[in-house]
Regions:
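Positively charged n-region of N-terminal signal peptides that target proteins for export
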Residues: 1-4
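Residue-level recognition of secondary-structure-to-loop junctions
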Residues: 128-129
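Extracellular interdomain linker/stem segments of modular secreted and single-pass surface proteins
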Residues: 156-158
Length: 158
């Protein structure tokens, strides 16, 4: 029985390792130099597995953020894949469901072909117009796998 359980575990490990195809590192920095980092997560479950870090700033502050996405799938290029990033108001810190993508504070997207181990990313700045709780999220799109990846940071603007 124990040997069968170990064999099953070993059989599942390679497929779990192959499922990961992108690594994402997201960093957000407030004007006072405080920064938070988030790394690749995936859905399901809704909201991912990892708790989101929280960056505190004030209305009118410019938040600098950068993300780097790496194709860690060693056997294949990502063709016609995409990445989307946005800042949107949400109701509470740690909110699991992504809020409706209406009245975005900032957004951007691009399409790319990415060879194995290649990286793509951007640096942006966004001025936070009003106090509130916001979601900064970067997500992969059209990666032709069974799931997409994202990284996210909550912004608490006072």
């Amino acid at each position: 029985m124990r040997r069968a359980a170990c064999s099953l575990l070993l059989a599942l490990l390679p497929s779990a390792a192959r499922a990961e195809h992108f690594d994402i590192k997201l960093t957000a920095t407030a004007p006072d130099g405080t920064s938070k980092e988030a790394f690749a997560d995936q859905t399901p479950p809704i909201g991912g597995l990892n708790p989101r870090p929280v960056l505190h700033a004030k209305a009118g502050d410019a938040i600098a953020f950068q993300f780097i996405m790496t194709n860690v799938y060693a056997h294949e290029s990502a063709r016609n894949a995409g990445i989307r990033f946005y800042v949107v108001r949400q109701q509470q810190l740690g909110q699991k469901a992504v809020p409706p993508l209406e009245n975005l504070v900032a957004e951007g997207s691009f399409t790319f072909n990415l060879k194995p181990k290649a990286k793509i990313g951007t640096k942006e700045r966004v001025v936070m117009p009003q106090p509130g709780i916001y979601l900064l999220r970067v997500e992969s799109q059209r990666t032709q796998r069974d799931h997409e990846h994202f990284a996210a940071i909550d912004l608490e603007i006072q």
